[in-house]
């Protein structure tokens, strides 16, 4: 899938989210990259054999003070080639993009991995 098509898939997935979630994402940059960089993998302690589809970088809403303004916009990175490498069809890519985006957006809202696993994400 070319980058333009993949980015459109990401945008459409975000549009399908409930409005109350979308409005809170206004200061969150959603960035598509091919793969996580080696520097990012090292910083996160991710072994080379592990696959990373997405990453939330920022301060979760639950950890922010009332008067605290973010220094930089939060970011959600979506790794296109990593997702495509693991999927066998465009339908699987679409489903994995949805799962990954919801997972990373949940981190923005303050949910941790254990909770997300418990609810199926």
What is each residue range found by the language model?
Residues 96-104:
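Short alpha-helical catalytic segment bearing the HExxH-like zincin motif
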Residues 1-96, 108, 115-117:
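Active-site rim/adjacent substrate-binding subdomains
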